[in-house]
Amino acid sequence: MQTEKQSRDVFYVSDGTAITCETLGHVVLGQFPFVANEKTFPFVESEEKLTELIKHIEISFQTNGIKPLVFFSLVLPDLKARLMESPAYCYDVLESIVQRVKDDIQMEPTPKLQRSRSVGKDTDTYFDRIAAIEYTLAHDDGISLKGLELADIILLGVSRSGKTPTSLYMAMQFGLRVVNYPYIDDDIKGLKLLPEFEIHRHKLFGLTIDPERLTEIRENRLAGSDYASTEQCQHELANVEALFRREAIPYINTTSLSVEEISTRVLEKTGLKRRLF
């Protein structure tokens, strides 16, 4: 029986990028409070690569005395069969879903290697993603306020409230062009909406955070500074949240949310539609 203090190796295996396996694996493992030693093996599309992977699985089993967990997605039946025979608990992350869809719509699936996000198969999607990322990077942390008419959304908040990681996630995963602007200490006195934002009010969205958590984050960056003090964090947050309320800017508290959750809630509250899947 697995205990909370006992660690276990976890492998994410795919004949593609393994991103899907990692994502679903993280969701599942998040419900089990044990220490996971995670390893990812992408592009396992040949007997040679599978043999190398199985060696790692066997070493894990021999070293730890318990079977590792393997979340996998493999198209070739022979590779899948060999993996299932290894000393591990193996979970095909797509099989049950694909089978259910097949049964419901009465259509045979046609799986292919590395189907997702291939540049050759969907050039427009690829370049749309790159354009969104480039725009977002160029407008990160208040670097530039030019071209706001091209923005899908403008994130506002104090420094270290989660704006940059959320912006990049929304660009990479949703294909959205995101501007993020930080309110720093110099802005707090007489805080008001920038003139550049007035005609883009419908794009404004605020991120806030509990002062205790903000202090903790800032302490990791600049320990012992006024910037990281509880009083400073409380002062900045109180003024920025007052601005959000005064200007009717919707906002959420990011304290206990992951980047994925923040991004999804922003879409939900703004009605924005993701451009890419």
From Swiss-Prot:
Pfam families linked: Kinase-PPPase
GO molecular function, one term: ATP binding
Enzyme Commission code: 2.7.11.33, 2.7.4.28
Keywords: Kinase, Nucleotide-binding, Serine/threonine-protein kinase, Transferase
Family of this protein: Belongs to the pyruvate, phosphate/water dikinase regulatory protein family. PSRP subfamily.
Record's function text: Bifunctional serine/threonine kinase and phosphorylase involved in the regulation of the phosphoenolpyruvate synthase (PEPS) by catalyzing its phosphorylation/dephosphorylation.
Name of the protein: Putative phosphoenolpyruvate synthase regulatory protein
Lineage: Bacteria, Pseudomonadati, Pseudomonadota, Gammaproteobacteria, Vibrionales
